[in-house]
Amino acid sequence: MKSKFEASIDNLKEIEMNAYAYELIREIVLPDMLGQDYSSMMYWAGKHLARKFPLESWEEFPAFFEEAGWGTLTNVSAKKQELEFELEGPIISNRLKHQKEPCFQLEAGFIAEQIQLMNDQIAESYEQVKKRADKVVLTVKWDMKDPV
């Protein structure tokens, strides 16, 4: 059963919020609170969000990323057991420019769990930060011999 917040989530899409508030929480508060566990906790948070907001296909990822304010996601390759995406946009550029070690594990975990839910196979995702190209590459892989 959905909580009242989850039931009203669609209404939140219409409210505009500045990136400053979002980045304060994501890039200052959470790393300070979680310390060395920040990266792994963000990955698991992404997986948790994917279970709360399951999508029908990976083609829906870009729209979700836009609505969530995570940036512009583009599929760049699709293989039998691997998908590769590029994540870019103003919020990504800012993070790449000003963070010594920017973390995109929330997005990686979200993609991994979505693929795992869709394929019923264990999936893992990882990030590659491309500072010069001003983008992040997110790769998800799964093994057909490794069912959930």
From Swiss-Prot:
Please name every pair of cysteines joined by a disulfide bond in this record. none
| Highest taxon of the lineage | Bacteria
The family database entries (Pfam families) matched by this protein are listed as: DUF2507 (PF10702)
UniProt xrefs under Gene3D superfamilies = Trafficking protein particle complex subunit 3 (3.30.1380.20)
> What is the recorded name of this protein?
Uncharacterized protein YslB
Encoding gene (name):
yslB
